[in-house]
Amino acid sequence: MKKIIFFFLTILITDKLMAQSITPKTATENKPTIAILDSFANAFNAHDVGKILSYMTDDCVFEASAGPSVDGEKFIGKEAVKKAFEDVFKNYPNAHWSNVRHFISGERAVSEWTFTGTKLDGSKIEVTGCDLFTFRDGKIAIKNSYRKNRPPIPKS
């Protein structure tokens, strides 16, 4: 009897292990999560452009909150987006996003935040804003940024 029980347990365990190794990712593994958005925000606060880009698709799009067209300045592809983010950190060496809150609906997500930073001329900025995200296969395909239009606070 022990041999029969052992035999069936071995089959069940082997079957379970084999199923795990060949089962494709579940749908939820490719969906946006609060953890992904938190990590993305943390990478921004660390000024870690490589880490930021690791959360984005190769053909990602960043629509900046300001620019010459109706949807701000648009950066397409990782190289262009990388340069745009590097410029933000160059122009605001102490850039920081706080009071971050996230919301998710399907493949879309929103992050609200307060941005603070000091420009190279010493003037300061503090504004609220949000990012609208479109995800594809668990990564950010579009980051569309909006923020309040408030003049910089002059250097004191």
Task: Describe each PLM feature range.
Residues 96-97, 125-131:
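Short, surface-exposed coil-to-beta transition loops
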Residues 128-154:
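Short beta-strand edge/turn micro-motifs at domain boundaries
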Residues 106-115:
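A short hydrophobic beta-strand element
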Residues 54-100:
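A solvent-exposed, acidic/Ser-Thr-rich amphipathic alpha-helical stretch
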Residues 91, 117-126:
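Short, cysteine-centered beta-strand-loop-beta hairpins and adjacent loop/turn segments enriched
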Residues 40, 52-53, 60, 77, ...:
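Hydrophobic pocket/interface hotspot
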Residues 1-24:
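Bacterial Sec-dependent N-terminal signal peptides
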Residues 18-54, 58, 78:
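Short, low-complexity N-terminal intrinsically disordered segments enriched in polar/charged residues
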